[in-house]
Amino acid sequence: MTPEDQEETQPLLRPPGGSAPRGRRVFLAAFAAALGPLSFGFALGYSSPAIPSLRRAAPPAPHLDEDAASWFGAIVTLGAAAGGVLGGWLLDRAGRKLSLVLCALPFVAGFAVITAAQNLWMLLGGRLLTGLACGIASLVAPVYISEIAYPEVRGLLGSCVQLMVVTGILLAYLAGWVLEWRWLAVLGCVPPSFMLLLMCFMPETPRFLLSQHKHQEAMAAMQFLWGYAQGWEEPPLGAQHQDFHVAQLRRPGVYKPFIIGISLMAFQQLSGVNAVMFYAETIFEEAKFKDSSLASVVVGVIQVLFTATAALIMDRAGRRLLLTLSGVVMVFSTSAFGTYFKLTEGGPSNSSHVDLPALVSMEAADTNVGLAWLAVGSMCLFIAGFAVGWGPIPWLLMSEIFPLHVKGVATGVCVLTNWFMAFLVTKEFSSLMEVLRPYGAFWLASAFCIFGVLFTLACVPETKGKTLEQITAHFEGR
């Protein structure tokens, strides 16, 4: 066995006597890091209340037309894709802690530019900056938290990444009821500012420090996080932290988690989650909710409640079980969604443009209201199922399955895949509905959910209760 193999497969962080650490400061450090995902969620949710506010804005404030509003929402995903690449580069060179500190800067700068915006280009520039920060935070925060957490709480703390994302989205929706777009952007500066402040007092992850052979700093970090540092092993002296090389993809400990990580990110976006979110307000309108903006808040509350539930049971139920159950729920709910659109579809049209409100707004009011409640139930079931499994777990597994020496590149590729697929699905879903009709598009999403369940059962290992080094050893076949 080579020194590199020893480093990747033996526990770097082994407590004396095999006992589990019980330090409480690890929760403080995880909270500080999770303020990045909270900022990320707020940036994602910002566009929903801000776009109507900008459309109402009187000169000289910038005004959004339909095309500009589309870009105002979508440009975040492009910035985040770039942020994923940059975050992967920073992760191994600047370290986990400094990467989180640095990602706070484009968050604050982006919201500050939006606050001061006098034209469309400033708005888009600010959104691009916040998107860049979203990409970095979505990569670095899960890795930081997974590397400071001991196995007994890694699922709980790792799931808090997605919990903070959906909490940030919900906060943006709620604040949007009382704040105009400029003040909403000011509020967006608060979470990353707190993260910047708190992370200055948090340690670098012990695993990263040990991989750099900074023994004393690693011992100090362990003492801070877990309360003691005696008896923990340093990697063999011959094991040096190495950059990623393409030849390493021949190793099963590298290519297997690569395939799993990329596939999970792709299946997450192909599940139809963005389409369901996009049409939430239309569905609530058809169910006769007078204030359709209530849809956003209801969706946000469901996400928060069920993501919190997932966090609490993650280390007992396990990743595979929750992914499988989540996928099954999503299969049935997207199938029901497609059935709703099939039953409410209007007659033949000469127009090639799919106008969803027209498709679901026919004259048979009583019948349609009943069917709309079917859609509302299906939508809520889908969101609950997604929040329990396919929402948080791909991000959690991404932070667990890669060995240290490829983690920066590998997680960067996974995040890039996720954001690129999000952009592609969001932009092309309307075109897909023109070809397949809305019911066909959602039935296709249901098929992808089935493939996701089968992939989970066939390829995804259980990681609960294992050290990160034991997970790597599993992929290496040792």
UniProtKB/Swiss-Prot annotation:
A motif (Dileucine internalization motif) lies at residues 12-13. The keyword Transmembrane applies. The chain crosses the membrane at residues 26-46, 71-91, 98-118, 128-148, 159-179, 183-203, 258-278, 294-314, 321-341, 369-389, 406-426, 440-460. D-glucose binds at Q162, Q268, Q269, N274, W395. The keyword Glycoprotein applies. It holds the Pfam family Sugar_tr. NCBIfam families: SP. Belongs to the major facilitator superfamily. Sugar transporter (TC 2.A.1.1) family. Glucose transporter subfamily. This is Solute carrier family 2, facilitated glucose transporter member 8. The lineage of its organism: Eukaryota, Metazoa, Chordata, Craniata, Vertebrata. The gene is SLC2A8.
